[in-house]
């Protein structure tokens, strides 16, 4: 229960799903946590849950596509807790789904702006704060979709998340000499509210579960434990990794 004692973390997309469970897990391991998402009332409930469990958290609502918001999150971490050690850039959007030739420019840009530009803006301001600390851990959420398995109808989502992997690897090469590790998690199907768009019928749910060697989807808590590994000193020699936490979807062919 003390893997992150004395550390301060930012978690975006924290109002639900993987981000919510990661924020609670980080706090339970001793971190001070800045929780970020668009819905203040959801963040307030998360902070209350963390504090009930004896942890420390502060909420700041906003949009990760807003550069001023990205800067404000880091400023809050430094002014309140004295610095920034960990950032989990997890906020995401499906974007418009369907045949690529039917996808609107607006639907395409939504996925790119949230998933890729949001990750870039977060990192842009998190990096100097970690440099001031003498090191840190940057973590991004990507996906197996388009990386190991192509899925029809997911062009905007897959392309934006593939871009996150490129960003992660570039940053890992740039920042390794400064003691900043940069990695990404690639979850398989996970039972979150965002993922319900993929499994809105029993038939779709059965199909998605069947893609996995384990024949089920992950819980958000299972993915959060992998994020904790990358955030902690347990992964002190890991950087530039696209870490599959996918229940075997990338190797299953039945």
Language-model features, listed with the residues they occupy:
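Alpha-helical segment proximal to the catalytic Tyr-Lys
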Residues: 128, 147, 173-174, 236
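Short C-terminal tail/terminal secondary-structure segment
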Residues: 94-97, 227-228, 239-254
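The beta1-alpha1 cofactor-binding region of Rossmann-like NAD(H)/NADP(H)-dependent oxidoreductases
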Residues: 41, 61-73, 105, 221
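Conserved glycine-rich cofactor-binding loop
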Residues: 8, 15-17
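Active-site helix of classical SDR
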Residues: 123, 160, 168
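Substrate-binding pocket helix/loop in short-chain dehydrogenase/reductase
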Residues: 98-100, 107-112, 208
């Amino acid at each position: 229960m003390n893997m992150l004692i004395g550390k301060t973390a930012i978690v975006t997309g924290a109002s639900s799903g993987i981000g919510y469970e990661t924020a609670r897990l980080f706090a339970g391991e001793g971190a001070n946590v800045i929780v970020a998402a668009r819905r203040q009332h959801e963040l307030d409930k998360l902070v209350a849950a963390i504090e009930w469990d004896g942890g420390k958290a502060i909420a700041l609502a906003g949009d990760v596509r807003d550069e001023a918001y990205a800067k404000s999150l880091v400023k809050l971490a430094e002014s309140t807790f004295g610095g920034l050690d960990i950032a989990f850039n997890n906020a995401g959007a499906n974007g418009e789904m369907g045949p690529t030739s039917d996808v609107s420019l607006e639907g395409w840009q939504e996925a790119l702006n949230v998933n890729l530009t949001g990750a870039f803006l977060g990192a842009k301001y998190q990096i100097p704060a970690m440099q001031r600390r003498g090191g840190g851990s940057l973590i991004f959420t990507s996906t197996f979709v388009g990386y190991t398995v192509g899925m029809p109808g997911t062009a905007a989502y897959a392309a934006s998340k593939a871009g996150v992997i490129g960003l992660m690897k570039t940053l890992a090469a740039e920042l390794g000499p400064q003691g900043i590790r940069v990695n990404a998690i690639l979850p398989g199907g996970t039972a979150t509210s965002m993922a319900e768009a993929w499994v809105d019928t029993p038939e779709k749910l059965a199909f998605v579960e069947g893609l996995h060697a384990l024949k089920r989807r992950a819980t958000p808590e299972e993915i959060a434990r992998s994020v904790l590994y990358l955030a902690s000193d347990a992964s002190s020699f890991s950087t530039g990794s696209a870490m599959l936490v996918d229940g075997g979807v990338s190797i299953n062919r039945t």
